[in-house]
């Protein structure tokens, strides 16, 4: 599946009407399923409680806070990819301090072209985190199956008097003979 087929939810946190207008034009494509605009850190936090966003763009400073803590919270506690827009004379310092959290930093003033390229980078980063999320789920599924098989083996050992290797072979053979996973067989054994 190409990136063009993926969809993203985006939260733009900015008190600048110019940036909101630019972002509105850039985010009008079909690949952006949900786009929310907020003008303060407090409203961004409320929006994030309602829905986790794939991409968060924070135009600093904001009326109620700078947005730094929000960026750190979203990048470390959520699966969101975060970009901060900072004044050009603060860029080096902010980048140095916030890149360790995986936060992208861009300087402003900026152009629509640079914002468009930045969105492409943010999408690429989000796809990378999605692949890690899938791998994590896959590993968790495998661990759950191992737990089920071990419980089923214990049941076969205690109730049927099988040795551990016999119970293991029994579950494996049943799974092979019936073309199902060991987890399915383990579930059946546990539910008898």
Identify the function of each model-found stretch:
Residues 33-40:
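Short hydrophobic/Thr-rich beta-strand motif most characteristic of the beta2 strand and flanking loop
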Residues 79-89:
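A short, hydrophobic beta-strand element within the central beta-sheet of small alpha/beta folds
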Residues 20, 44, 54-75, 89:
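Conserved phosphotransfer microenvironments
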Residues 120-134:
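The C-terminal output helix
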Residues 69, 88-104:
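Alpha4 helix (beta4-alpha4-beta5 surface) of REC/receiver domains from two-component response regulators
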Residues 137-192:
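C-terminal output/effector regions of signal-responsive regulators
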Residues 6-18, 23-27, 56:
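Conserved acidic segment of CheY-like receiver
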Residues 110-119:
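C-terminal output helix
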């Amino acid at each position: 599946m190409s990136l063009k087929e993926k969809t993203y939810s985006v939260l733009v946190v900015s008190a600048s009407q110019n940036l909101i207008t630019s972002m509105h034009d850039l985010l009008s494509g079909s690949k952006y399923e949900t786009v929310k605009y907020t003008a303060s850190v407090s409203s961004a936090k409320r929006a994030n409680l309602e829905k986790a966003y794939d991409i968060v763009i924070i135009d600093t400073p904001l009326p109620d806070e700078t947005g730094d803590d929000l960026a750190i919270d979203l990048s470390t506690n959520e699966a969101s990819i975060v970009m901060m827009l900072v004044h050009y004379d603060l860029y080096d310092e902010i980048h140095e301090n916030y890149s360790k959290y995986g936060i992208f930093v861009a300087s402003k003033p900026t152009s629509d072209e640079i914002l468009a390229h930045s969105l492409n980078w943010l999408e690429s980063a989000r796809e990378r985190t999605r692949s890690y999320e899938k791998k994590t789920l896959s590993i968790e599924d495998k661990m759950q199956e191992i737990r089920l098989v071990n419980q089923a083996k214990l049941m076969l050992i205690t109730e049927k008097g099988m040795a551990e290797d016999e119970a293991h072979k029994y579950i494996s053979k049943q799974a092979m003979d019936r073309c199902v996973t060991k987890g399915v067989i383990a579930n059946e054994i546990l539910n008898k």
